[in-house]
């Protein structure tokens, strides 16, 4: 056990208490003292833990009034180039020290153009970008078609080559709900951004379809035969026949459409005539009923002249 008694020094003599008097240890560091040689790295960690525990238990008022030499504390931590084999993980301070040793330096994540657009917006510019004013000089030279051809070829080549953009490592841990982890062997990196959420319906096996019709036989012609003029003549005649058949089919379709429109107009006209005929029949039936009633009334009462009957008939018609 260490002699850890507090003793205030003689302030008038200017002799403050020394740390080695409190701990019975040498002044030149407990962990790497060449003279003593009794402490190793593991012992220095244990010593630091014991000193920290005693600092927690001591009276804070006495602790503030006494003078301590912090070189021993600093020496214990500066000599720890490699973490100890057996670390006391129950101690909170040692856990913090171990985390600091193992933690890598912070590196700013590299964003691709899409993530930069989402994070900073379309108007964001990196510092030092667009500083050269020469880039804004306008070029009024009109290029001919021959000069434009190599540029179009370059752009077409650049569009065909597709570069796989890797997702930054800082976004690998984040996954949305229902999203499955993807491997590079199954599909490309770009396809993983736009893959829809997996569903249980896709897991079901697709039934096999058996075609009921037979496909016509088609054999590809060799390149030598395609170069011959006879083959070109056959292809020209065939194309001409195909165009004629297509034009004829279009004409027949137009003729059918015209006949269909005429039939629709004729049907509407006949329906209107039929409706007018029905209305005329209804009027005739009502008139006949009215005449019968008048005849019955005249037979019971005084007779009316035939002239009055005809006048009433004409009025009802008009």
UniProtKB/Swiss-Prot annotation:
The keyword Coiled coil applies. GO terms for biological process: defense response to Gram-negative bacterium; DNA-templated transcription; regulation of transcription by RNA polymerase II. Keywords: Coiled coil, DNA-binding, Nucleus, Transcription, Transcription regulation. Residues 173-190 have a biased composition (Acidic residues). Residues 1-13, 307-318 have a biased composition (Polar residues). InterPro entries: bZIP, bZIP_sf, C/EBP. It is found in: Nucleus. Residues 232-266 are annotated as: Basic motif. Residues 275-298 have a biased composition (Basic and acidic residues). It comes from the Eukaryota. Residues 267-274 are annotated as: Leucine-zipper. One of its GO terms (molecular function) is RNA polymerase II cis-regulatory region sequence-specific DNA binding. Residues 1-20, 147-205, 238-257, 273-318 are annotated as: Disordered. Residues 228-291 form the bZIP domain. GO terms for cellular component: nucleus. Residues 242-280 form a coiled coil. Disruption phenotype: RNAi-mediated knockdown decreases survival upon infection with P.aeruginosa. Belongs to the bZIP family. C/EBP subfamily. Transcription factor that binds to the promoter and the enhancer regions of target genes. Involved in responding to mitochondrial damage. Has a protective role in response to infection by the Gram-negative bacterium P.aeruginosa. This is Transcription factor zip-4. It comes from Caenorhabditis elegans.
